Amino acid sequence: MSKVIETKQQVVTEIAEKLRASKSTIVVDYRGLTVSEATELRKNLREAGVEFKVYKNSLTRRAAESAEMAELNEFLTGPNAIAFSNEDVVAPAKVLNDFAKNHEALEIKAGVIEGKLVTLDEVKAIATLPSREGLLSMLLSVLQAPIRNLALATKAVADQKEEQGA
């Protein structure tokens, strides 16, 4: 086998593994972004723990088929970049959606969230969700509210008794 074919097979295997391992994968068309805008986007994604790569569509198609995500192939036309996140489902959608609001050249095409193909509208809906940490803090405040209210009520009763006794 030639060295070129071996290299391409390694890339296909790498993409397929990333597709299988990632909780969230978003495909975007980056045509029209300047170098500085693309660098800014990569920096924002890196800070959010998201990997952003450009692969050849033919290699990505083969990888999607081997990862049993062949439905993604219809979106692999033109210049594409793929954002992979192994930790946070919301992070790539949020960063890409926020960046696309300010830079019309970036077009979100589709995504795969936990193995399920999602459309542009679904990606935008996911982008509006709070992050995992945000959801946990909301849950924590909801769980603490009854205890806090009980403590405040007890303190109010104690203050009232103290006033009556004085």
Swiss-Prot record:
Stated family: Belongs to the universal ribosomal protein uL10 family.
One function term, GO molecular function aspect: structural constituent of ribosome
Keyword terms of this UniProt record: Ribonucleoprotein, Ribosomal protein, RNA-binding, rRNA-binding
PANTHER family cross-referenced by the UniProt entry: 39S RIBOSOMAL PROTEIN L10, MITOCHONDRIAL (PTHR11560)
Quaternary structure, from the entry: Part of the ribosomal stalk of the 50S ribosomal subunit. The N-terminus interacts with L11 and the large rRNA to form the base of the stalk. The C-terminus forms an elongated spine to which L12 dimers bind in a sequential fashion forming a multimeric L10(L12)X complex.
Species of origin: Bacillus mycoides (strain KBAB4) (Bacillus weihenstephanensis)
GO BP terms in the entry: translation
Cellular compartments per GO CC: large ribosomal subunit
PROSITE patterns, A to Z: RIBOSOMAL_L10 (PS01109)
Origin organism lineage: Bacteria, Bacillati, Bacillota, Bacilli, Bacillales
UniProt keyword Ribonucleoprotein, yes or no: yes
Pfam annotation, one family: Ribosomal_L10
Keyword RNA-binding carried by entry: yes
Superkingdom classification of source: Bacteria
Name this protein carries in UniProt: Large ribosomal subunit protein uL10
